[in-house]
Amino acid sequence: MSDKNKLLLLFDRPLETVIVPRGPDQEAFDVPVDLLSDRYKAIGVQVSNRFGEETKSKIPVKKISPPPLGEILDLPRQANFSLFIPKHRKIAGRLINIFLGMKDTDDLQSMAIFARERVNPYLFNYCFSVAILHRPDTQDLDIPSFIQTFPDKYLDSQVFSRAREEATLVPEGQRVPIEIPRDYTASDLEVEHRVAYFREDLGINLHHWHWHLVYPFEGAEQVVRKDRRGELFYYMHQQVIARYNLERFCNALKRVTRFTEWKDPIPEAYFPKLDSLVASRAWPARVTDQKLSNLRRDQDQITQDVDDLYRWRDRIYEAIHSGFVQTDGGGRQELTEFGGIDILGNIVESSNLSVNRTLYGDLHNMGHVFISYIHDPDHRHLETFGVMGDSATAMRDPVFYRWHAYIDDLFQQFKGSLPRYTEEQLNYPGITVTGVSVQSQGGAANTLNTFWQQSDVDMSRGMDFQPRGSVFARFTHLNHQPFAYNITVNNASGGNKRGTCRIFLGPKTDERRTAWLFKDQRLLFIELDRFVVNLRQGENTITRNSTESSVTIPFERTFRNLDLSRPVGGEALAQFNFCGCGWPQHMLIPKGTPEGYDCQLFVMISNFDDDQVVQSTEGICNDAMSYCGIKDRLYPDKRSMGYPFDRLPRNNVNTLQEFLTPNMRVQDCVIKFTDRVVVPRPRN
């Protein structure tokens, strides 16, 4: 194939046939008639001719004999697609395997066109994205951000009628961004709406979607089996809950309440104000005090009782407390100190790496399904699932955090059964952290500054049947002044040493402004950075910028123009996709308060000899490795994820100060929020 980048044009305008010109260069695929859908087989030539003047070049498409799609076509083109629904994930696995099985990119292009013309657009986008990420001959391609293909999953439904007007009537150079209000899903009467800026943030929801793209829980072995995948499921979501709780504290709300009683009413309502442009339907809402019901959704082949969740939960608890799981072959597998959390993660989620899905079930995924169908459990009203049913939208819903607080508590039950870290396991003899401070650009020492910022996103690639050219939506999100860590370390070990610098941020007091017990506080520390340091003998000064964080992806990657910010050159481009997975840089630190929210910055230097994973990562994208790992490599830190806060403290340690060893240090700091909006520069 002369230019495999042409594959990316198949993401553009997902409802339009591929024979219509697409992309900035107005290219059209020259498709053999057999690959077209029945609707266009007879009129394909007329459609091509109609757009002939717009078409600047034709992309040749190889004629192949595609395999039958079979049950993949069971999902109607106008339906919504959910990874959490077993039937949907099964057919997704089949389509991914078909794409992975194509012998070269020419065959892949032909097969993708054949499928795209026939299958559900959401299903196609997911399966084609996973295949591109995992095929050796395509994994260097830069797949479009999901918001640019399906902006309807992220933007207020009122935007699209205004966007059509702008696209149809206004010349491209004179179009102005369509501003989305910050408070469009609820009013201040709803206390949970205080943290809507977090739940509905584009970058956070794109992170969740991209993480599940990189770590699918169904499909071929090569797609699902990744190093410490189950443990990463636990850690990434644990950090999401910790971050959410910090935002709640900044907004005078208590910690999120675990969703434990599944037959009780759910007091939190959610009205998403989203429309599906594929289904031409509004996303269903959940009103106050609805209850979960047994599911009888024949169309989705779901027959499941709420009691099944209880059965699966009890069996998982039994495994945790007995220290082993039963495999589907009838054997036992121990939940060991370092490997047990990975086994448990795959069971709880569950992925097809679960050692016994028949016994331990599908707790996390089906929890999403039960909640997402709460408004129509037996399909009597012909309604689709709510936002909890889609990894691209689930984090918008307040109940997502209640459900994941419960899931995290399961993992904490296991972590509580492990031996506590001894001082020897925490200390680094001869290494003392003597000073820590943070400095914002133009701000006071140990003060982090946050504010509102507006950014634009181009919707045109996801707007079918509209005139070409960019149409921008402008939305308001949290951001912060960049800052730097200044850390001084004394090396009295008698030789040069290497260490891993681990930086966390946590709340100084609980929601009642009382001092923490460390066993509770440790669960609210959010990871800010993790990096290797070389320590000479004597005093060392370490300076690190917040933008270098191992947790986040750069701001430009979340709000990128696909054609302007794509990296140039093989290695940079090769890793761009995996790097698309990561916490958004603009949400690295919590909002804070106008008077200043009191936090504690924790810095630790651990012994690199105990952390090191021997492997080459040269040329590899690892800028967001903490939550996402590294592509085709082992997770780059031998320690348990969340170390040193992932286990209960040793005996007689009740406070953070008592927990510290010489290679750790804590610095009090404040996060100050200023209620101002930074507006982007005019485009014209």
Swiss-Prot record:
The active site is at 349 (proton acceptor). GO terms for biological process: innate immune response; melanin biosynthetic process. Pfam families: Hemocyanin_C, Hemocyanin_M, Hemocyanin_N. The keyword Metal-binding applies. Cu cation B binds at residues 364, 368, 404. Its main location: secreted. It is found in: Secreted. Glycans are attached at residues 80, 352, 356, 486, 491, 545. Binds 2 copper ions per subunit. Its cofactor is Cu(2+). GO terms for cellular component: extracellular region. Cu cation A binds at residues 208, 212, 237. GO terms for molecular function: metal ion binding; tyrosinase activity. Residues 1-50 form a propeptide. Signal peptide: none annotated. The keyword Disulfide bond applies. Belongs to the tyrosinase family. This is a copper-containing oxidase that functions in the formation of pigments such as melanins and other polyphenolic compounds. Catalyzes the oxidation of o-diphenols (N-acetyldopamine, 4-methylcatechol and dopamine). Cannot oxidize monophenols and p-phenols (L-tyrosine, tyramine, gentisic acid and hydroquinone). Binds to the surface of hemocytes and is involved in hemocyte melanization. Activation of the enzyme in response to bacterial lipopolysaccharides (LPS) suggests it may play a role in innate immunity. This is Phenoloxidase 1. It comes from Holotrichia diomphalia.
